[in-house]
Amino acid sequence: MVAGKYTIGLGQTKMSFCDDREESPLDKSKSCKTVLMQLFESSGNTNIEGADTFNACYGGTNALFNAVNWVESSSWDGRDALVVAGDIALYKEAAAKPTGGAGCVAMLIGPDAPLVFDVGKRASFMRHAYDFYKADMSSEYPLVDGLLSIKCYLEAVDGCYKAYQAKVATVVPENGNTANGNSASALVDEFDYMAFHAPNCKLVAKSYARLVYNDSISHPESSMFITGLPAEAPDVEYEASRMDKTVESIFMKLSKKRFAERVQPSLLVPTMCGNMYTASVYSSLISIICSVPAAQLRGKRIGLFSYGSGLASSLFSLRVVGDTGKMVNILDLHRRLDARKVVAPETYDSMCKMRERAFQKKNYVPEGDIDELAAGTYYLKYVDEKFRRTYAVKGPSEPSDEISAGQVNGW
C-alpha cells in the first residue's frame, strides 16, 4: 500500500467502528423513535410527536427541518423538539472500508437558541439515482457505485448552490447578511464557516472548491478571479467540469486559504471518526462549535450542505447569535475523542466478521466485549426468538438498567 493513501488521499486519520453490541436500524416497520420512548417512561410523558425519517445520509436533515417547521407552526405547544441522527457506515469491499465510520448526534430545537436558521435561505436539489442504496435485505452492506456517487454528490453541490443563490437574491438584504457583515460579490463569502456531509474529508475540500468554481461563472468580476485565475483557464463544458482534474486542481488551489479558515475547523470529527452517514454534517457543525472560540464564532454565519444518496440534498445556513460556550462544555468533544482506544486493523476486520455473523440472527447473545465500553454507554444485550431486542447501560463497573427492543448508537 502506498504511504498516505488514506491520510492524504481521503483526508482521514482515524475511524470509529462498532462490533455486534451496536446496531443501525434493521426493522422495516418499527421506528427507532418508539424504542427511545422508553427514556421518557419514568416521567410518564407519552405525548411526544414524530417518527423516524430516512433517505440515506439525508434523514437527519429532514428530521431537523420537520422539527424547525413544527416550532414555527400553529401546532407548536411551547415545548422543545429533539432530533436524533445516527448510523453506522460499513462496506463489504476492502477498498471502501476506510471510508466507514459511526456516530450519533442529538440536537435540541427551540426558541432563543444560540444558533438560528436564516429565514428564507434554504435550497434543495433532488433527483432519482442509484449511486448508493440498500435494496439487499439479506445484508447490512450497501450497494455502491463509487464513481457515480461522487458525480451525484458534486451535482448536488452545484444544484443546491445555484438554488441557494436564487433564494438569497429574493431575501431583503440586512446588516450582517454576508461574511463579516460586508457585501460580497462572490456567494461563497456569504458564509464565515461551512460544514459539509463528509463521506471523506478530501471530497469536502473538492466540494468547497466547486462552490468557488460556480462563483467564477456567476461573479467573474470578483477580485478573487481577476487576480487568482491563470490566464489560460481550461475551456470545459459545465457538466464535464465536475470530474475534470485540471479544473479541480485550479480551484482547489484558489480556494485553499478560504478552505483552511472556513471549512477546516469543521473536519475535526469527520477526520477522527469517519463517515457517520446521516449524522455526518452535524458532526461537522459540532466540530466548528468546539474548534472556534465562542467569542470569535458569535455573529457569524455557518453554511451547511447535507447530502443523501438516491438522492436528496439541501444547502442552508445558520447564524450564531448567542454564546456557544455551554455547548462546548457539555459536548466535551476533545476529551472524548482522546479517550478512545486505538486498535489494530485486524481487530476491525474481526469486528466486521462478528457483525456479519450477528446480522438477522434471533436467540442471539452478542460477542462484543462490554469491558471496553465507557460508563453510560447503551449496548445490545440480547435478541430473543422473536427478534425482540434488549439493551442495557454500562455502569461504572458492570452493566445495569436494561431497556428493550431497539437501537442506540454512540460515538
Positions of predicted regions on the chain:
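Acidic, glycine-rich active-site loops and adjacent beta-strand->loop/helix elements
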Residues: 27-30, 55-61, 84-90, 112, ...
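Condensing-enzyme catalytic core mediating Claisen C-C bond formation in acyl metabolism
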Residues: 1-26, 96-179, 224, 228, ...
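Short beta-strand segments
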Residues: 81-87, 108-110, 120, 197, ...
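Conserved catalytic cysteine-centered active-site region
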Residues: 1, 18, 29-80, 214-280
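A generic local secondary-structure boundary/capping motif
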Residues: 70-73, 93-98
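C-terminal catalytic subdomain
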Residues: 236-245, 260-342
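Long, repeat-rich segments with strong aromatic
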Residues: 190-207
